[in-house]
Amino acid sequence: MKVMAQIAMVMSLDKCIGCHTCSVTCKQAWTNREGTEYIYFNNVETRPGVGYPRGWEDQDKWEGGWVRTSSGGLKPRAGGRLKKLMTIFHNPKLPTIDDYYEPWTYEYDRLLSAPRGQATQPTARPISQLDGREIDKIEWSSNWDDNLGGSTATLDNDPVLQQMNLTVRKEIEDSFMFYLPRICEHCLNPTCVSSCPSGAMYKRTEDGIVLVDQDRCRGWRMCVSGCPYKKVYFNHKSGKAEKCTLCYPRLEVGQPTVCSETCVGRLRYLGVLFYDADRVPEAAATKDPQDLYEAQRSILLDPHDPRVVEAAIAEGIPHSWIDAAQQSPIWDLIFRYDLALPLHPEYRTLPMVWYVPPLSPVVDSVTASGLDGEDHKVLLTALSTMRIPLEYLAGLFTAGDTRPVEKSLRRLAAMRSYMRDINLGNEPNEEIAQSVGMTGKEIEAMYRLLAIAKYDDRYVIPTASPESPRGITSLDPFGDVDPTNPVKLLDDLGMGAPEACSSGCGSGDSQASKISLVSWSNGERPAGMFPDRGAQ
């Protein structure tokens, strides 16, 4: 058993409101420059829908991910080394700009420089950000079908619907939808790393983050076609591949990713998981695609097991990382409550961004029919009869196996009904918890984690090299930085709110007050927000 650590994320889809704040802040932080106009490390898709790029789940077309060989091994779906060498100068499975969209801007100078009093109203025509030519008609964008806006034209092209042989009503009153935020999966068995001829893609051993070495990248773009989630992009200006970095500079100082920090719905959870690296090939090569979900769960190790802790120490994993893994919300959502599921495990990459499936399509349908959307008996009956949402979610998260999805949704439904009784002042009904194999205390703990968890409960992130202070040499490019002061370090690097209020904060001294409003919870008085009248 070789224990390794992985920074993982879970997103609770019921809490996503589709505001795209995560996409905007991620783009401003990482891809707000020439050559990256079409690149979105984080994007939010409306489901059912074709996604971004269009039809990225159609692996018959793109040939991303792995396939199992007749001998029980794995090979990239797009082919091995010989095929890569034969097509290295022309990759036939590469998405074109039309599969994404041609980024554009407008001729704002024409508006600003238009002479006063001219007979016609000046207009700002769209122009391409790739070659500067005028665009006659804008036909697609990164979020064209948001909120089922393109349902009549694009809904039938959803690869999951086609794969599951499902037909969804296009009338808005009969349709169902939910939002799916996507980032790089930082897989345990990434195809992009194996597809790169230059060896520029690599997975960090200390935290499992998959990155691109910009110095070694030669722009072959095999990683783009190899990634089944299409989360590796090509910068047409630099000629290099780029991808989501999981905001590793922030994680190294104990701060969450930008998308997590700015998420309005507070739907993201970050934490450490341990896994057995020796069993990754075995799990990824599981014969039945519907068994891949359980196979991946089987290689994730219990951080409370003394044998796992002993093996982690032997591998040099710091004690602070072991403590973080034991407090990880990711472990609770995947194992303790059996809620979180991986995205398309059939790609055999063992993704490490998991999702709590949404109950909202079922609740909305039940409520629209005039029934009680909070009654667990009604919801559990609806889950058994409304097969389209259930089978669609199974096509996304469990390779078509509806049992894990139904189990997760049943527990979410039980939580709604159980907590309603408590909030209304009624006696808790233990039968509701027992109907889904849980106790009332477990339901309440699950509710606290999903609904009202505080900042430090959602993000349990150990710092890099926690047992020793950071070397000052590595921080020289940032100027005068004190590596022993984490509050000042974050402030100097511009990497988010400080962890705590500094001494004298809000007491009326000459120094500016610094308050972390991100970690403030309703009902509490943030220290330093208001001056102490008694001290004046």
Task: Give the positions of each predicted feature.
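Non-ligating segments of multi-cofactor redox enzymes
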Residues: 1-536
